[in-house]
């Protein structure tokens, strides 16, 4: 069995099933689209449910994917067992009414034995005891009966109580006695172990359960499979646990740079208890940071609500585990690059780093605050600390129970862990009834509110007088608080985060106290819950004041989002949908589906169209109507109708005959108040989804254009300087400084820079050809190829020299490999007409964590430098 990287395993899976006429589906976002039943995409089939249910026509009836997924229901086992993860990749092959058991079983055997070259004798197979058809197909594929284990309904039958269901067959790999001396009893009795690793599960969707336990055969039978990439990687790389595979180990080695401790792979067998605890902490951080990075990259935001609450919990748990590893500084945000390098997904690295760093800073302050709170609860006469209070510190303030126990231990005080676990169980039971969101958790756990109680006046007013209906923390209703908590007002002008618009900011006045608004969100009844900072009581009236500057910024960018959406549909086509948006007072983002990035010309057309709407000074209307009438008037249903409490009275925002949208947000009264509009970036968010970033208002747009102008002028000066270094008498053409506006001037400078880059490239080519002595080129005969390797070339000339050698020396089998070393990084170009340069480069890049590629005659990119690079190059040359 050949050692394979995770990248190679993933690609082999997709290539194999593509060769079996499966359509390759790219991994979708971790955040479900139009599926309120899921908090996260949690399996390979989760994004394909509508194809199996018949709600949508599939693009093909044979599909395959490698889908990223998140599950956090078993978090306590992460890092403790060899294979539990919160983030993982599920390899899948699916048949929608096409092939069934015979083909699915044959494909599985062929892939594992012929493609991955696994030892057939080390594979074991379970099947449902009544499914003799599946058993016989395994026998037909050469499986010895001693390697077939029958299972019960509990182990080998998928049934959710009603709907499609059926038996399944599982494939296990035997890693040998060194992992567990017990034999097949482990499989037969379904005992958790590290010897027999489940690597593949094939579900035969064969029956329909009517909910009463009556089963009928489905006319359309389906195949749903899942194979864990992490498990396959650990087997193919012959390492003790998933965490020792290439998907995790580089992350762990990066964490080691900030810790005085080391992760020891060999401890799996050595069983040193202290080292085991150290290893577990490394594993937990490596697992959690993968989840956090990919979730944020897909658009999740750290918060106390829903997905954001889970991200916050994982980040804080990781931060504390870092403390246990002796890490004193902020370090989690420094792991983003190594996580990104280990996986094939593209996203804006800086956004993820910024989000994680902000949460790290916040939690570091929380820990200091938690220590003070802990001291305030102490009773030095009592040597046992109330576990319920310890749980409250964890849930309300995010203060880890381990840290509470550690601080108290130093004072000779223990924590009543029975009381802690009881409080935890009560909290879990109270939270199960509602949606998995932070706000529901708060409301459900207290049972404070059972109906709509407040009145929102923020559409027309920026201030309001009100009485306080309720004050509470996350556990109890309170009569008052000293530093902050949650507030329900009878009347509020503060808009709650929803529909892509961020919440208002401002303050509440109560007597002599000024209370700061930190967050505003809605509970399930539509009440506005205010999270505030300051001193407050529940018996004095209050006055609330929205910050008008923040509100106008929010309204600009929310109205700008509507106008942008309209312009996109006009320029790119009416098929464009709004997949997500986020508007704050400074900028807006808009996510939309597209097979490829819009061209610069298309983006300019969109921008110009939005500006034309501004110039037209169109009044805004708020219209309350029914869903049916909203559709008749052409309103775009960008929000789920379920957000509106009464479908007979929904709200439409209309700007003349330009755009009508279902929307609950606040907006400008006229398009002219947007003042200006500028798209600052268009980036690929994930497969098939792009994100536009934009700003509005004359002030912000002018500030942005001025910064761009400064940067362009610096770039212009740099390129002119570089050209003069190559040709001292060069005179750059002048730029017209009398352009009508700064944006036109910037476009002029940008165009001139592009022209000068071409001049520089040509001069550099001439210079490189003069400076490089081609007479010194000597070829080595390797596998019947004429190979020239030189890794000491100036970085600016690597590509040119590689291509020149390829073209100058027409020896039939010339392969030029030119590189430039920079500390531990290597810039490498492969130029040849004898082999596929791109394929060879990809193999090297996979081995050395590289990126790049190109065409069959020239491929180029960066990778880690290795002393063995030349021998690797020789190994990866195909046989002539």
From Swiss-Prot:
Location within or outside the cell: Cytoplasm
EC number: 6.1.1.7
UniProt binding sites for Zn(2+): 558, 562, 663, 667
Catalytic activity: tRNA(Ala) + L-alanine + ATP = L-alanyl-tRNA(Ala) + AMP + diphosphate
Record text on cofactor binding: Binds 1 zinc ion per subunit.
GO cellular component terms attached to this protein's record: cytosol
Predominant localisation class: cytoplasm
Gene3D superfamilies, sorted: 2.40.30.130, 3.10.310.40, 3.30.54.20, Bira Bifunctional Protein, Domain 2 (3.30.930.10), Threonyl-trna Synthetase, Chain A, domain 2 (3.30.980.10)
GO molecular function terms listed in the Swiss-Prot or TrEMBL record: alanine-tRNA ligase activity; aminoacyl-tRNA deacylase activity; ATP binding; tRNA binding; zinc ion binding
UniProt xrefs under CDD domains: AlaRS_core
Description of its domains: Consists of three domains; the N-terminal catalytic domain, the editing domain and the C-terminal C-Ala domain. The editing domain removes incorrectly charged amino acids, while the C-Ala domain, along with tRNA(Ala), serves as a bridge to cooperatively bring together the editing and aminoacylation centers thus stimulating deacylation of misacylated tRNAs.
Name by which UniProt lists this protein: Alanine--tRNA ligase
Organism whose genome encodes this protein: Mycoplasmopsis agalactiae (strain NCTC 10123 / CIP 59.7 / PG2)
Gene name in the database record: alaS
